[in-house]
Amino acid sequence: MKKDMTLNRKRVFLEKFFHVLFLLAALFAVISVALIIIFIFGKGLAPFFPNNQFGTYNFVDFITGLKWTPQSGDYGIGYMIISSILATLGAIVIGVPIALLTSVFIAEVAPKPLANIVRPAVELLAAIPSVLYGVFGFAVITPLVKQISPYPSGDSLLAVIAVLTIMILPTIVAVVETSIRAVPQSYKEGSLALGASKMQTIFKVVLPAAKSGILTGVILGVGRAIGETMAVILV
């Protein structure tokens, strides 16, 4: 009996100990995030309020301004917004057709041994950090763009679009290819039985049936193109 009571006390103690430990860990995480948010908002909102080192600043000028020189009190992010939109649109216009055709090739056209090699390679590319894509763009793409660009450094929107296109391709391909493979086999068999060719079946039956997955892949690609700042900074 005494031994059982001792074991029960140990269990209760350990349970309370870990409960308190996990609670402290959760509180630490919440407080850390809250402090980060307060710091970011404090620094970000400082120019819009009087009696600070930056002085007052108009929110409309902040959104529409085309000049970013904090040293002189100019905080316009309009050109950043425009550049982000143009770079994302360019990457989507170039990347989506390539990703769509690549997904069709992996899911429907390529022999199974080849598809089993290409599919993991695409998934591996999707896991590469953005900083590595940025280094690749800086070392490879920027010098290539430099040869056709009027800017001596090679820094241009074209280089950014090229890097973002390469970045979003694996993400879109992985999602779209999975959606294509999820289309029921009966759809394909029915189309072929009606006399359609394989390509007609793919583009008129399979792709429309997988349109929700295709849209999801495009949205994820857009999200990554907009959110990946490190690669753009390096390029």
Language-model features: locations:
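Glycine/proline-centered hinge or cleavage motifs at structural transition points of membrane proteins
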Residues: P129, L194-G195, P208
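Transmembrane-helix boundary motif in ABC transporter permease subunits
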Residues: K10, A91-V122, P143
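Residue-level signal for discrete positions within transmembrane alpha-helices
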Residues: M80, S84, P120-E123, A127, ...
